[in-house]
Curated annotation (Swiss-Prot):
Organism of origin: Neisseria meningitidis serogroup B (strain ATCC BAA-335 / MC58)
Protein name stated in the entry: Histidine--tRNA ligase
Family listed: Belongs to the class-II aminoacyl-tRNA synthetase family.
Alphabetized Pfam families for the sequence: HGTP_anticodon, tRNA-synt_His
Keyword Protein biosynthesis included in the entry's annotation: yes
Length: 431
């Protein structure tokens, strides 16, 4: 027997049934996708779909060459034809903005776009963290004021309500100011951290040289006291940045959205400025961040477009749905409305015709394949979760009738004329 080929570690199959080490099903995932589609339409966002492979230079320029994502986590390879360096996308914002710039989508008006799809990072797989993971992203492009910052946070809070997990999520916010303010803070931070360099772990020493702001994001408990006493970026904000942040917080207050100000919240990508935020939970162990984002006012220009202030966020679907599956609510109905059975010569063709007619009227119908006893077929109908069973046997063929059974028992079992099949089932379904 040939050896089985396994999936790549950290990359999961999505099946009709739960797996031992991956509890999400395709039906649960589809129900979430349907919810996201309705949610984004309600806020006026249009979907965009981009390739999963991009030129590596896109991520070097946007995310930052010295970030962990670009430096350690991307899947990068050379195109065999022209040695062009390509990478599987590690996040969605850069790809979305590349498409916006390439196709000049901002030529006459701002854009509200959303995307959903797989991302790839070479990380150590664990619960809530995978090498292939999926994100939903929201990008509001060409909007400058703090009102859009507050709106997209309200938008995310609305989704948490729909999924029944709002009480399990905490909003953390911060302001990173503009480029000049960050540069002044960076100089003070480097001077401060250098005094403690002998106490820093190896990862923090590396970040001190490449991206010192990320040192403040360390999870090392031995460094918390040093980080807590470090210069705060908020103390380096100029008047414009302060006003933006104050107005943003006032809008959150007016919307009744509670938040925690976290001066050490910096996010892991270099393109952020001004408003940044994360939604976190204490229900998923170490993987606390479910959703995060912020402003990236200079990124479109960095990618070759005209300056356009913008803001966005992304949520990890696997992590979010693990939270929903344990604590939230999401209506999942993968079962068919009708299980169609047949018995005897000619009944298989007739039941196929009935099934097609029912599907044309909006019923989901699973038709039995093969030739088994009605008892065996009824057992399969029960296992399918169908609400109704449709039976066509020799008596029904001869009399031009069908037998219907309500699997929940409300309407019992009835034999009706074939022409009454659809209206009877519609009446039962709506009762």
């Amino acid at each position: 027997m040939a050896q089985k080929i396994q999936s790549v570690k950290g990359m999961n199959d999505l099946l009709p049934v739960k797996q031992k080490d991956f509890k999400l099903t395709a039906a649960f995932w589809q129900a979430f996708e349907d919810t996201v589609g309705r949610w984004t339409r309600a806020y006026g966002y249009q979907q965009i779909r981009t390739p999963i492979v991009e030129q590596t230079g896109l991520f070097v320029r946007s995310i930052g060459e010295e970030t962990d994502v670009v430096g350690k986590e991307m899947y990068t390879f050379s195109d065999s034809n022209d040695s062009l360096s390509l990478s599987l996308r590690p996040e969605g914002t850069a790809s979305c903005l590349r498409a916006v710039v390439e196709h000049n989508l901002l030529y006459n008006s701002p854009q509200k776009l959303w995307y959903m799809g797989p991302m790839f990072r070479r990380e150590r797989p664990q619960k809530g963290r995978y090498r292939q993971f999926h994100q939903v992203g929201i990008e509001a492009l060409g909007f400058e004021g703090p009102d859009i910052d507050a709106e997209i946070i309200a938008m995310s809070a609305d989704l948490w309500e729909k999924l029944g997990i709002r009480e399990y999520l905490t909003l953390e916010i911060n302001s990173l100011g503009n480029r000049e303010e960050r540069a002044a803070h960076r100089a003070a931070l480097v001077e401060y951290l250098t005094r403690y360099e002998d106490k820093l772990d190896e990862d923090s020493k590396r970040r001190l040289k490449t991206n010192p702001l990320r040192v403040l994001d360390t999870k090392n408990p031995d460094l918390q006291e040093i980080c807590n006493a470090a210069p705060r970026l908020v103390d380096y904000l100029g008047e414009d940045s302060q006003n933006h942040y104050v107005r943003f917080k006032a809008m959150l207050d007016g919307l009744g959205i509670q938040y925690i100000e976290n001066p050490r919240l910096v996010r892991g990508l270099d393109y952020y400025n001004q408003t940044v935020f994360e939604w976190t939970t204490d229900k998923l162990g170490a993987q606390a961040t479910v959703c995060g984002g912020g402003r990236y006012d200079g990124l479109i220009e960095e990618l070759g477009g005209k300056p356009a202030p913008s803001i966005g966020f992304a949520m990890g679907i696997e992590r979010l749905l693990l939270l929903v599956s344990e604590y939230g609510s999401l209506e999942v109905n993968a079962a068919p409305d009708v299980y169609a059975m047949h018995q005897g010569e000619g009944a298989d063709l007739q039941v196929m015709k009935y099934a097609q007619a029912l599907r044309a009227q909006g019923f989901n119908v699973m038709q039995h394949s093969g030739y088994q006893s009605l008892k065996a077929q009824m057992k399969k109908a029960d296992n399918s979760g169908a609400r109704f069973a449709l039976i066509v046997a020799q008596d029904e063929l001869a009399n031009g009738t069908v037998t219907l059974k309500d699997m929940n028992g409300a309407h019992g079992q009835q034999t009706v004329a074939a022409e009454d099949l659809t209206p009877t089932l519609q009446q039962w379904k709506n009762a």
